Design a protein with these regions (language model features):
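Alpha-helical scaffold segments that flank or form the walls of functional sites
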Residues: 2-16, 36-44
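Residue-level detector of anion-binding/catalytic polar loops
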Residues: 14-15, 48, 136, 170
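Short acidic/histidine-rich active-site segments
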Residues: 21, 169-173
């Protein structure tokens, strides 16, 4: 963490956010890592640190793979659907419900990359819920990479952005 803060300081950044994938993502950090983030100083090398996680949405009920007690200690929580972790039904209605339910969790700040065409979603419904719950929707740069693994992202991003503009919902990039 200190090395990243130093690199950020060297680039003149005032703040950075560090959001490692939560434990159910293969190769990610153990629960203990996330529990111990609360003791990490939030200012290092003159750079403000926002420490959190990218939690995995596990099912259509919006459950995530970290307990609320741990999420409550974080500065920033992103919740995303990832193929290795999501075990719920995969219809458009079920995926939409997964996002809507996750946004009801007061500890979740951002819905990560909802533009992945492998998980079709009702964008109007999630944009309206994002406005209601003050949850940001992420436009992920990996989604825009030519030849990326996510499908239909350009069209999905344009639809999401059009609706975010219409309903005045801010996004996260």
């Amino acid at each position: 963490i200190r090395e990243m803060a130093k690199a950020a300081a060297d680039k003149g950044l005032e703040a950075i956010a560090l959001t490692d994938h939560a434990p159910d993502m293969p190769g990610s950090c153990h629960l203990f890592y996330f529990q111990n983030l609360r003791v990490v100083p939030r200012n290092q090398c003159g750079v403000k640190l926002f420490l959190g996680t990218e939690a995995n949405i596990l099912d259509e009920n919006g459950s995530v793979d970290l307990p609320d007690s741990v999420l409550a200690e974080m500065d920033l929580v992103i919740a995303s659907i990832h193929p290795p972790c999501y075990k719920g039904a995969k219809t458009k209605k079920d995926i939409t419900n997964a996002y809507l339910a996750a946004m009801e969790n007061p500890h979740i700040d951002i819905i990560g990359h909802p533009d992945d065409g492998r998980f079709m979603v009702d964008y109007e419904a999630i944009v309206k819920k994002a406005k209601e719950t003050h949850t940001l929707l992420e436009l992920n740069n990996s989604s825009l990479r030519p030849g990326g693994f996510r499908v239909n992202t350009r069209e999905d991003d344009l639809e999401m952005l059009r609706l975010c503009k219409k309903y005045e919902v801010p996004i996260s990039i």
